[in-house]
Amino acid sequence: MNPDIKICGLKTPEAMDRALERGATHVGFIFFEKSPRYIEPDLAGKLAERARGKAKIVAVTVNPTNDDLDEIISLVRPDILQLHGNESPERVLTIKAVYNLPVMKAMSVRDADDLKRVEAYIGIADRFLFDAKPPAGSELPGGNGVSFDWSLMSWLDDRVDYMLSGGVNKDNFAQALASTRATGIDLSSGVESAPGVKDPKKIDEFFDAVAEACLPEPAAGS
């Protein structure tokens, strides 16, 4: 099965079109103002129309209020809400009930204890995204270009459908997929020339690597 590929933090028509042309299954807009990948909802709404019907549109939020979500959903009309903050299971349930959209819950990982928090969200979140915990001093919950120990993912069973993020790029994506049960990967800094600047050439290089790769089967027991 081919993995889902999400290009996150898109801000320009050029990067959006290249991601779509090369086969991105998901495209993400970041609505966290401290991020260099932040985009105003009205601009995101215009870019989203280029992707509608071609890839899943993902709205990435961090501890959003209902007012935040009202604006984003009205202007962008996303297919999926990604919650990348400290949203509780109860808050995730409320968001799903109010907005009737699938939720991808992002979880920051440094060690096995971090993964144990997943249990509380199983059956609530529709999918998970596992990212590395931010380095000390970083204000960004994701997109830091930092990886974590993917062998930790062996703790998870097939109740957990997830994407991998955190420092994924053209050089390590095959290893990430082969050593875990991940059904998709999420790229942001891995296809940038500078923070927040998606590079169509790097997008090409990544998808060229995907096309050339012979992805091994997932590791036994992972």
Swiss-Prot record:
Protein's UniProt keywords contain Isomerase: yes
Documented EC number(s): 5.3.1.24
Gene3D superfamilies on file: Aldolase class I
GO annotation terms (biological process): L-tryptophan biosynthetic process
GO MF term (any one): phosphoribosylanthranilate isomerase activity
Superkingdom classification of source: Bacteria
Keywords: Amino-acid biosynthesis, Aromatic amino acid biosynthesis, Isomerase, Tryptophan biosynthesis
Catalytically driven reaction(s): N-(5-phospho-beta-D-ribosyl)anthranilate = 1-(2-carboxyphenylamino)-1-deoxy-D-ribulose 5-phosphate
Protease in keyword set: no
Annotated metabolic or biological route of this protein: Amino-acid biosynthesis; L-tryptophan biosynthesis; L-tryptophan from chorismate: step 3/5
Enzyme class name: isomerase
Family: Belongs to the TrpF family.
PANTHER family named in the record: N-(5'-PHOSPHORIBOSYL)ANTHRANILATE ISOMERASE (PTHR42894:SF1)
Protein name (database record): N-(5'-phosphoribosyl)anthranilate isomerase
Species of provenance: Rhizobium rhizogenes (strain K84 / ATCC BAA-868)
